[in-house]
């Protein structure tokens, strides 16, 4: 079985396991599917030939590829996450394989009229000639991050079967609940024992990322007073309208649909409720730490304004920081970025260095003493029914993992 065949076989099998995390759950991991998947990976890591394969009570899977050199090489790690996003259903994923893709529109689901088009997704024709894997139009695919996870598995298998490629000790980890910001919450950096690591959790070919958002989540509860609408004058307080009023205070242009590059935003992720009570969940993002703090203060000030207007119980705010920009922790060990950059160039891949408009486990791990930049995996349109992945790009990602390991040994 060549690399491409192994990638397809593993990936299509892995995405069929429902591993969506759950923001509302307080268990670790938050869903049983992640435990099921972790147990499967433990067995497969052992089958490949890795050692020190463990899965702890919190669902964190770790394993070791022993060094095959006498050189004193720093221990490096490769990480991916077990869970998939909560934005769209991940149950009963039916991956569709399109070999030698012609670059044109793909009808994902004729019955539901779900069509992946170049008009909506202009990057699509660039994958002409590739083998791509799509959804059937009813679920997300789960390439985020089962593409990265698959690539690590295939790369480790490749290194074991090609002992002429010299490398130091490599540690592998698969983490739960990344999509809800809890990935590193119970990650044992000391037990992992790597000097630094890479998350395989990026997007298109060439992605190399070591700047991430500063991130916070804000949960707002709006409490109203419900009465019969016929006699509601001066009595009713509509909680849903309070939520609408709060949102109206936020700058319209500071939203994901209007921002790019280094621009931050407020994002209304969900709004549920009725006259009596409504709940809104926002995420707050900015690359600049001062701007990040200013955004959080803006939310607090809006809440205060509304409390003064309607009463303290009318709006209740719970806000917490989720992760910070990893750049601060990557810069002192810039060589780990340089080696990844050189590895890509040597494989005729043009590195695309850009800020992550999101977060990875590496965002938090970098602040826990494990500097962790992010590398591409080949996926596009994450978290929805139009998600797809290029197997050709996945193969390139495997080659990058192998080349990074080789270069660390060579330069030791």
Swiss-Prot record:
Documented EC number(s): 3.4.11.4
Major location category of this protein: cytoplasm
Binding site for Zn(2+) 1: 81, 144, 201
Cofactor note: Binds 2 Zn(2+) ions per subunit.
Protein name as it appears in the record: Peptidase T
Species the sequence originates in: Bacillus cereus (strain ATCC 14579 / DSM 31 / CCUG 7414 / JCM 2152 / NBRC 15305 / NCIMB 9373 / NCTC 2599 / NRRL B-3711)
Functional note: Cleaves the N-terminal amino acid of tripeptides.
GO biological process, one term: proteolysis
Active site: 83, 178
Family: Belongs to the peptidase M20B family.
InterPro entries according to UniProt: ArgE/DapE_CS, Bact_exopeptidase_dim_dom, Peptidase_M20, Peptidase_M20_dimer, Peptidase_M20B
Keywords: Aminopeptidase, Cytoplasm, Hydrolase, Metal-binding, Metalloprotease, Protease, Zinc
Gene Ontology CC, one term: cytosol
Signal peptide interval: none
Keyword check for Hydrolase: yes
Pfam families in UniProt: M20_dimer (PF07687), Peptidase_M20 (PF01546)
Enzyme class of the recorded protein, top EC level: hydrolase
Binding site for Zn(2+) 2: 144, 179, 383
PROSITE patterns attached to this UniProt entry: ARGE_DAPE_CPG2_1, ARGE_DAPE_CPG2_2
